[in-house]
UniProtKB/Swiss-Prot annotation:
Membrane-traversing stretches: 8-24
Organism of provenance: Physeter macrocephalus (Sperm whale)
Keywords: Acetylation, ATP synthesis, CF(0), Hydrogen ion transport, Ion transport, Membrane, Mitochondrion, Transmembrane, Transmembrane helix, Transport
Protein name per its UniProtKB record: ATP synthase F(0) complex subunit 8
Family: Belongs to the ATPase protein 8 family.
Superkingdom of origin: Eukaryota
Gene designation per UniProt: MT-ATP8
Membrane topology (UniProt): Single-pass membrane protein
């Protein structure tokens, strides 16, 4: 059974990495990032449900 020839692997891996870097570098450098991202204020809304004030088997409103 012949041995696997790994003598060209270094050159292959190096050329693939160089090619990927060359192809992806312009895409990454052209990407625009926002200068100062600010969080959006969130507003909570009260839900009006019929069981908020009505008596049910699991809820008795405080009087």
């Amino acid at each position: 059974m012949p041995q696997l020839d790994t003598s060209t692997w270094f050159l292959t891996i190096l050329s693939v990495m160089l090619t990927l870097f060359t192809l992806l570098q312009p895409k990454i450098s052209m990407h625009l990032y926002t200068p100062n991202p600010k969080p959006m204020p969130t507003k909570t809304q009260k839900q009006h449900s019929p069981w908020n004030t009505a008596w049910t088997k699991i809820y008795l409103p405080l009087l």
